[in-house]
Amino acid sequence: METTYKLLDGKKISGEIKQEIAAVVNELLEKGGRRPHLAGVLVGHDGGSETYMASKVKACEEVGFTSSLIRYEDDVTEEELLACVHRLNQDPTVDGFIVQLPLPKHIDEQKIIEAVDPRKDVDGFHPINVGRLSIGLPGFVSATPKGIVELLRRYNIPTRGKHCVVLGRSNIVGKPVSQLLLQKGEPGDCTITICHSRTPNIKEVCLTADIIIAALGQPEFLTADMVKPGAVVVDVGTTLVPDSTRKSGFRLTGDVKFDEVAPKCSYITPVPGGVGPMTIVSLMSNTLLASKGLYR
């Protein structure tokens, strides 16, 4: 059975949210306040990290935030990076900041994450923010899960009592999005199943899902025979795969085999233009919360 699917258009929704944030910033300025300030720390010249950081800086401009970028070469020491984090923690003009991951092998990522002041941790990676999320307290929620849930909210996707299968158990997407959709209220109140590389019967589990969130990082893993008619599919995957027809030689591919899965869905996110833009705009909304003093 084929259904006519609708796109969960992250590009469109993120544009609407940017306008809402820009309006709040204008209000702040009219009342004599200052622009929210997001700082980013970038180590080395990883292509993906450069692209992400550039899109974050651009989004700051679009919503009227101040942004600053602190760059280090690959050979930066852990001590230097920790000192930078400490300076940003202490700087009253910086509302929130992010340290772009991955970091070089000689630096302990967890140590850096835990050095960030939870009140400025707009990436939502600090154990205190992760813990607050798990017990339903206000805190900074990691940007991708926050963006996914906001996308479901804006499209009025019913979640209460629905079976949601999350493919992937990463600390950045799989675990937090499961926590969010488990919480009381809409979007939330889901029955959650998390599948991962050791789950033996992923296909059977997926066939019972009303909502599937694919966050494995395996291109085109989810195929049509794994999806029941009318399901909602959210594709978090972003893998560059070789494509000789493209000028760059690559194309961005999700974890879902879009062309064959989409006709079975009620709603599905495209890649690109689905979850990606929602991630960036969620970072902006976290920064706005930080500037208002989420923890105060």
Curated annotation (Swiss-Prot):
Classification via HAMAP family: THF_DHG_CYH (MF_01576)
Alphabetized Pfam families for the sequence: THF_DHG_CYH, THF_DHG_CYH_C
InterPro entries the record matches: Aminoacid_DH-like_N_sf, NAD(P)-bd_dom_sf, THF_DH/CycHdrlase, THF_DH/CycHdrlase_cat_dom, THF_DH/CycHdrlase_CS, THF_DH/CycHdrlase_NAD-bd_dom
Protein name as annotated: Bifunctional protein FolD
Catalytic activity of the protein: (6R)-5,10-methylene-5,6,7,8-tetrahydrofolate + NADP(+) = (6R)-5,10-methenyltetrahydrofolate + NADPH; (6R)-5,10-methenyltetrahydrofolate + H2O = (6R)-10-formyltetrahydrofolate + H(+)
Pathway connected to this protein: One-carbon metabolism; tetrahydrofolate interconversion
Binding site for NADP(+): 168-170, 197, 238
Keywords attached to this entry: Amino-acid biosynthesis, Histidine biosynthesis, Hydrolase, Methionine biosynthesis, Multifunctional enzyme, NADP, One-carbon metabolism, Oxidoreductase, Purine biosynthesis
Quaternary structure (record): Homodimer.
This enzyme's EC code(s): 1.5.1.5, 3.5.4.9
Cited NCBIfam families: PRK14185.1
Single GO term (MF): methenyltetrahydrofolate cyclohydrolase activity
